[in-house]
């Protein structure tokens, strides 16, 4: 009720003015926070604190179930207090659950079995938060991250000593510098790739997906990105500490893996090319089994590059401390296996040999018979043993047809109908539903960018989709500023062949186990339907702790699932030093599927989570 000195109209005007001022200040602080949140040190934490205090409700809103969700019944019961997860011991800061060193040494060394995945049983799983090392800082933005890594993030100097003469990595002040050298490219990765490009069509989009077996610090993959080629690099967790960790700190795709006794976690015909640059894989061992596995994942018409022993043995036999006869015999044996796989040697000069796989088996001229693999599903590879057999080409109707289907050049390949779909090989997916999936994920990613304006910038370089489906999320996000590891859960429909046919990369994985990577290697994780999928297979807590392990401090996770599932997820992550917001579906509050956005707080070993790292100035683009 207004007084004569303050009539009601004035009160309303002042209230409106006050509201506008508050909203204006709120938005100002939000934008200031976003601008400051360059991903480096105190800028991140200050911006997060400002945003937390201001809480602009017109930018990001919490769900209000009561007035809107009449069709979604939320049980009204007292929420149990969330479990607060404690930090793991600091010595576990680089813990990799399925490649843990003490456990690995209990397994045979034969065929590199001890370097393969050996995950802990349920009663030995860690249920604590893996800490970041003291001084941890958000990586430099791409492309600077290709050349520089903060020492505090991966404090391992062994490679600077062991590979000092090979220009792999140098230690300068408080950073590692990666000059782009390598054992087999002393003139730099660019010069090496240019030589390959004189034979292989690397620059025109014909080659989009590549495999680097035994990648070192992934300089080849890093410089292939300049040619718009995505390289899946892998190396074991071995004496060269942190090879894969360095690769991911640089913003280059990589996993911990080895060619050993089990099949690689990729579908058949996934890669346009593969290379071994002094990777030390014994290609002639076990009757050529490892080359047969490379052949399985290499597309018809694809290329295999071998640089290093035994190529150019006449020059290097003394350096390698091996006899001419031994090296000559090894090269002849490799070439014989290649012929049996229907590969043709296209080039040999200096330290490099290049082979090309025939486009189908009609032009094969094998001098010796080979055993073909009898398994019906060549993509059923999870924990399956490698066999000494050749994966047969898909059938063709004429000599000019590419077995398995010809792919368009990239980027047209990204949205073209993949052969697996046009041939009806993916149950329940046709050309129409594929196009619907494209449109759906374009819409959803646009919505994500409204939630967080830094999505699509260099702030989030390493991205993972935990349940990738047809690769729609990654395709909608496609940009030189980021790359996406598309994970196909082993208990879901097998669509990884579609992901690769679109010119994207990915891997099979079971989320009841640890992922084959180091801690703190992803900036942004997307989890659509993951927890509905796994809620009866293993503990959601274990999947979330693994998500926390591989997520960088101040990285984000976007969960998309049924609201009751997300409520269960939220109760767990509230005890994991994450900040969360539960939000409506893009199509409105009546849709039972919701979105949970989470940010991992910055904290390091030994502190209480309130400290910030030192600053490193840079801006996202």
Swiss-Prot record:
Keywords from the named record: Glycoprotein, Golgi apparatus, Membrane, Methyltransferase, Signal-anchor, Transferase, Transmembrane, Transmembrane helix
Glycosylation, residue list: 321
EC id: 2.1.1.-
Annotated GO MF terms: methyltransferase activity
Q: How does it sit in the membrane?
A: Single-pass type II membrane protein
Positions on the Cytoplasmic side per record topology: 1-14
Question: Where does the protein principally reside?
Answer: Golgi
- GO terms, biological process: methylation
Disulfide bridge positions per record: none
Assigned GO CC terms: cytosol; endosome; Golgi apparatus; Golgi medial cisterna; Golgi membrane; plant-type cell wall; plant-type vacuole; trans-Golgi network
* Any matching Pfam family: Methyltransf_29
Indicate the family of this protein.
Belongs to the methyltransferase superfamily.
How is this protein named in the record? Probable methyltransferase PMT14
Instruction: State the organism named in the record.
Output: Arabidopsis thaliana
Q: What lineage is this protein's organism placed in?
A: Eukaryota, Viridiplantae, Streptophyta, Embryophyta, Tracheophyta
């Amino acid at each position: 009720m207004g007084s004569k000195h303050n009539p009601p109209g004035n009160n309303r005007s002042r209230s409106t003015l006050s509201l506008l001022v508050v909203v204006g200040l709120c938005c100002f602080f939000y934008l200031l926070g976003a601008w400051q949140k360059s991903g480096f040190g105190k800028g991140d934490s200050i911006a997060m604190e400002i945003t937390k205090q201001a809480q602009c409700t017109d930018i990001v809103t919490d769900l209000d179930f009561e007035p809107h969700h009449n069709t979604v019944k939320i049980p009204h019961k007292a929420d149990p207090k969330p479990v607060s997860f404690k930090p793991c011991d600091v010595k576990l800061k680089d813990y990799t659950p399925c490649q843990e060193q003490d456990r690995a040494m209990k397994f045979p060394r034969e065929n590199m079995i001890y370097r393969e995945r050996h995950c802990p049983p349920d009663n030995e799983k860690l249920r604590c938060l893996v800490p970041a090392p003291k001084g941890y800082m958000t990586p430099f933005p791409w492309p600077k991250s290709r050349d520089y890594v903060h020492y505090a993030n991966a404090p391992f100097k062994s490679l600077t000593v062991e590979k000092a003469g090979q220009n792999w990595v140098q230690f300068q002040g408080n950073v590692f510098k990666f000059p782009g050298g390598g054992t087999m490219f002393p003139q730099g990765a660019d010069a090496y790739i240019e030589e390959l490009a004189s034979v292989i069509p690397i620059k025109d989009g014909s080659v989009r997906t590549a495999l680097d077996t035994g990648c070192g610090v992934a300089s080849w993959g890093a410089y292939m990105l300049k040619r718009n080629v995505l390289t899946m690099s892998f190396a074991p967790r071995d004496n060269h500490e942190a090879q894969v960790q360095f690769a991911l700190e640089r913003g280059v795709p990589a996993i911990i893996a080895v060619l050993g006794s089990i099949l690689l976690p990729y579908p058949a015909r996934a890669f346009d090319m593969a290379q071994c640059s002094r990777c030390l894989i014994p290609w002639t061992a076990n009757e050529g089994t490892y080359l047969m596995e490379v052949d399985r994942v290499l597309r018809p018409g694809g290329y295999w590059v071998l640089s290093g022993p035994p190529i150019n043995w006449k020059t290097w036999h003394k350096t390698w401390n091996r006899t001419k006869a031994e090296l000559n015999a090894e090269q002849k044996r490799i070439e014989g296996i290649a012929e049996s796989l229907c590969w043709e040697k296209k080039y040999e000069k200096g330290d490099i040999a290049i082979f090309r796989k025939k486009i189908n088996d009609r032009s094969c001229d094998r001098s010796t018979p080979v055993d073909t693999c009898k398994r019906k599903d060549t993509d059923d590879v999870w924990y399956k043993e490698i066999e000494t057999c050749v994966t047969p080409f898909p059938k063709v109707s004429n000599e000019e047809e590419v077995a398995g289907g010809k792919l368009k050049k990239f980027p047209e390949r990204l949205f073209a109908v993949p052969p697996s779909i046009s041939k009806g090989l993916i149950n329940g997916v046709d050309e129409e539903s594929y196009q619907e999936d494209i449109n759906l994920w374009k819409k959803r990613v646009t919505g994500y960018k409204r939630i967080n304006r830094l999505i699509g910038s260099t702030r989030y370089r390493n991205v993972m989709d935990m349940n990738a489906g047809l690769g729609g999320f990654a395709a909608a996000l496609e940009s030189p500023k980021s790359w996406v590891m598309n994970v196909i859960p082993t208990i879901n429909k097998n669509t990884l062949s579609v992901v690769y046919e679109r010119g994207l990369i990915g891997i099979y994985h079971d989320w009841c186990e640890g992922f084959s990577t180091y801690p703190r290697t992803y900036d942004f994780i997307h989890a659509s339907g993951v927890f509905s999928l796994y809620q009866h297979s293993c503990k959601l807590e274990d999947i979330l702790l693994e998500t926390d392990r591989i997520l960088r401090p101040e990285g984000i996770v976007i969960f998309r699932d049924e609201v009751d599932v997300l409520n269960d997820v939220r109760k767990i992550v509230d005890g994991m030093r994450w900040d969360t917001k539960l939000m409506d579906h893009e199509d409105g509050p009546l849709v039972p599927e919701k979105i949970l956005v989470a940010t991992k707080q910055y904290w390091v070993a030994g502190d209480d989570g309130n400290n910030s790292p030192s600053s490193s100035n840079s801006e996202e683009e």
